[in-house]
């Protein structure tokens, strides 16, 4: 299952969907209101989709894998806190996903204090917020390191132009991969899909 990021739609994940399908996967490319409404609406939608899988005669041999890009990572984590969806998801792969807050968010919020009142999903990006997935879920993290754009000078040495390496690190990850791609391209390359395939099938990104 593909989960897009902030201010995007399922169309932004279209290339990854096509690439994974070429590699033999059955892919659900989901769409969420991740621009203006509170993220709780998206959490309810993802929860409903997972429960439909659980009670819809899911083959036990089929793995359920959630792939979250950008803010989609926080949407996954918040949804999986719900006890009703425990045990459904086998693996989570996070792509350039800020797990708590981000430098860009903090700086823009200083300049525009009403930012989170307009773009309500951004409220989940807080310096002291937690990010924790169930220990039974295998987690892989992919982080871009090809810097570009006007914000890159704020972000430190390793960044993809939108988020930096530290913002995406998850201590509970089984594997973390850095690849030299920018934020807006990292999820669209066949190479990224092949790394995802490796992690799903072998538990490591590079083989």
Show the residue positions of the predicted features.
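C-terminal catalytic-base region of ester-bond hydrolases, centering on the histidine
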Residues: 134-207
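Serine-dependent carboxylesterase/thioesterase catalytic core
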Residues: 1-6, 10-11, 15, 20-21, ...
């Amino acid at each position: 299952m593909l989960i897009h990021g902030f201010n995007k739609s399922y169309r932004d994940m279209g290339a990854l969907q096509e690439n994974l399908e070429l590699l033999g996967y059955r892919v659900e490319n989901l769409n969420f209101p991740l621009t203006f409404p509170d993220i709780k609406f998206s959490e309810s939608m993802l929860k409903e989709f997972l429960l439909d899988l659980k009670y819809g005669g899911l083959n036990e041999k089929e793995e359920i894998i959630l792939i979250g890009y950008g803010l989609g990572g926080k949407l996954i984590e918040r949804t999986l806190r719900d006890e009703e969806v425990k045990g459904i998801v086998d693996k989570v792969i996070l792509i350039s996903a800020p797990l708590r807050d981000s430098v860009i968010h903090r700086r823009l919020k200083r300049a525009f204090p009403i930012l989170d009142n307009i773009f309500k999903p951004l409220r989940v990006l807080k310096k002291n917020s937690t990010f924790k997935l169930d220990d039974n879920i295998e987690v892989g993290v992919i982080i871009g390191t090809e810097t570009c754009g006007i914000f890159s000078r704020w972000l430190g040495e390793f960044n993809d132009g939108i988020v930096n390496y530290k913002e995406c690190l998850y201590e509970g990850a089984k594997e973390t991969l850095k690849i030299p791609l920018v934020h807006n391209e990292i999820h669209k390359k066949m190479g990224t899909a092949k790394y995802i395939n490796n992690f799903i099938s072998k538990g490591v990104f590079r083989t």
